[in-house]
């Protein structure tokens, strides 16, 4: 919920951490910031002022349960760009933490709640990347997980996708 209170204060509230984040990011949308601002080089138009009417109230809820991004065909696009250009790494097939942070930001801006990470054999599986600890904890607190401390992920194993359980520490 995004509303202007009787005393003129902007109120942002959500039913959970997602809803609150979406409410905060709705302000950026009202200001003209595209969810794709970083990925598509969409520079927001500068505004001198921004006002909401005293009666402004917006209440939104999702129309589908799972909304997210599935990283696919990363072997020719995302992974080499991340690994060689955006955050060079000696770890073969790694999509690094800075790239994942940008993906998570996009997910929030798009009001998503689900992330299906890259899973081709050439890519280091998301949950096996070195610098993922902070992101795991962030995801555990923000993204809906099957249980409080477990995430089921599909990992490439001998050319087949195998469901494995990972404990978030």
Task: Describe every region a protein language model picked out.
Residues 2-168:
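Feature activates predominantly on carbohydrate-active enzymes
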């Amino acid at each position: 919920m995004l509303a202007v209170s009787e005393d003129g204060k902007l109120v942002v509230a959500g039913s959970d951490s997602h809803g609150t984040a979406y409410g905060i990011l709705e302000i950026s949308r009202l200001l003209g910031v595209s969810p794709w601002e970083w990925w598509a080089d969409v520079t927001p138009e500068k505004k001198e002022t921004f006002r909401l009417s005293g009666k402004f109230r917006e209440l939104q809820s999702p129309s589908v349960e799972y909304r997210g991004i599935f990283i696919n065909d990363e072997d020719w696009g995302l992974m080499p760009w991340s690994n060689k250009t955006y955050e060079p790494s000696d770890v073969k097939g790694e999509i690094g933490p800075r790239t994942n942070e940008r993906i998570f930001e996009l997910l929030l801006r798009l009001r998503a709640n689900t992330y299906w990470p890259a899973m081709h054999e050439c890519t280091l599986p998301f949950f096996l990347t070195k610098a993922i600890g902070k992101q795991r904890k962030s995801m555990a607190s923000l993204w809906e997980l099957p249980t409080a401390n477990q995430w089921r992920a599909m990992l490439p194993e001998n050319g087949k996708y195998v469901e494995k359980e990972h404990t978030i520490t």
